[in-house]
């Protein structure tokens, strides 16, 4: 009788161990899935959105590694662009790039306008309009005669200033692409037009298609973090030829340029 009790206790303990191990393995599988890794990697940056005051980045630390020189506090780089095909075979692409140097606490950048020829994937011309950031205002350094363009630049907002990715963890069943040799990682999630970020983009940009977009999260470099790699997000509303429409956003922290 004592043997049966001991055997029953042994079986109970064994079952408990298997259950605990099974739960642990399930969590590990979830943790180790590429989708989860990509979302966690992006969350480090996207958790900062929306950045109401860009100058707060002067006091914001980012991912650091051996690429930084001693004493370098690093530089934040922001980019937001809108690309749309308005003419067969051509894509108009324009946006803003801003460098916020944490050493000098100065922000410089430019607004660019370019035209890409679809057939050759070449830029016919790119015009860069130099600018800087004073307090919370964009100040043009170049003369802009087109009043409409001038207003657009001075009132420009980066996606990182109004987007909110608090629901990133809820995006499911992403299409995953990886290349360990580069390395690069990509996750695509289908969104609805009811998504708050999508609504805001439709308010800001002349997006004519009614198609709901695909959100693409792209990483070049170590998925755990790298100052020489980069991450960018893209809301792709249409990939149809001559109807291409996309919004791209990039927030990166890296070593400062000695000349900046």
Curated annotation (Swiss-Prot):
Q: Which residues does UniProt call coiled coil?
A: none
What is the recorded membrane topology of this protein?
Lipid-anchor
Give lipid-anchored residues (N-palmitoyl cysteine). Answer: 23
Span of the signal peptide: 1-22
Q: What is its main location?
A: membrane
Q: Which PROSITE patterns match?
A: PROKAR_LIPOPROTEIN (PS51257)
One of the record's GO cellular component terms: plasma membrane
Can you locate the S-diacylglycerol cysteine lipid attachment residues?
23
UniProt KW keywords? Cell membrane, Lipoprotein, Membrane, Palmitate, Signal
**According to the lineage, what is the superkingdom?**
Bacteria
Q: Which family does it belong to?
A: Belongs to the staphylococcal tandem lipoprotein family.
What name appears for this protein in its UniProt entry?
Uncharacterized lipoprotein SAB0390/SAB0391
Q: Which organism is it from?
A: Staphylococcus aureus (strain bovine RF122 / ET3-1)
